[in-house]
């Protein structure tokens, strides 16, 4: 195999290392542990520069995985549940933290979405 084919194979493997999640109909709510909250501006997500907020964390379950949610639309600090643009409900469980898989997915998500400007707002997010 020549270098060109190896490079294409590498690009393919990198692209499939982050995959789509179940539909909202199949998975209407999700619990995130070891979570963070990020503000995002610019890139493909908000080319107009408007802020979007995203939860990043780990989903426990039969196939636990790192997860980045679509833009948070509403958040209830009492229940620690947020509804995202997709309509999925995310519950932030336990204390904030860092998960290696979640942070890997986050870094890939940022790259895929044009490396927008990012700020970790976990400690200042209202009601968290």
What kind of feature is each model-predicted range?
Residues 2-81, 88-128:
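Cysteine-centric segments in proteins
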């Amino acid at each position: 195999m020549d270098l060109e084919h190896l490079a294409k194979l590498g690009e393919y493997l990198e692209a499939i290392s982050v995959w789509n999640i179940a539909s909202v109909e199949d998975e209407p709510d999700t619990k995130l542990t070891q979570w963070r909250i990020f503000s995002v501006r610019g890139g493909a997500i908000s080319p107009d520069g408007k802020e979007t907020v995203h939860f990043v964390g780990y989903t426990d379950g039969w196939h636990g995985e790192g997860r980045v949610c679509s833009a948070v639309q509403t958040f209830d600090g009492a229940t620690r549940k947020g509804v995202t643009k997709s309509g999925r409900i995310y519950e932030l469980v336990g204390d904030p933290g860092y998960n290696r898989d979640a942070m890997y997915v986050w870094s890939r998500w940022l790259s895929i979405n044009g490396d927008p400007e990012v700020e970790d707002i976990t400690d200042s997010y209202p009601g968290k």
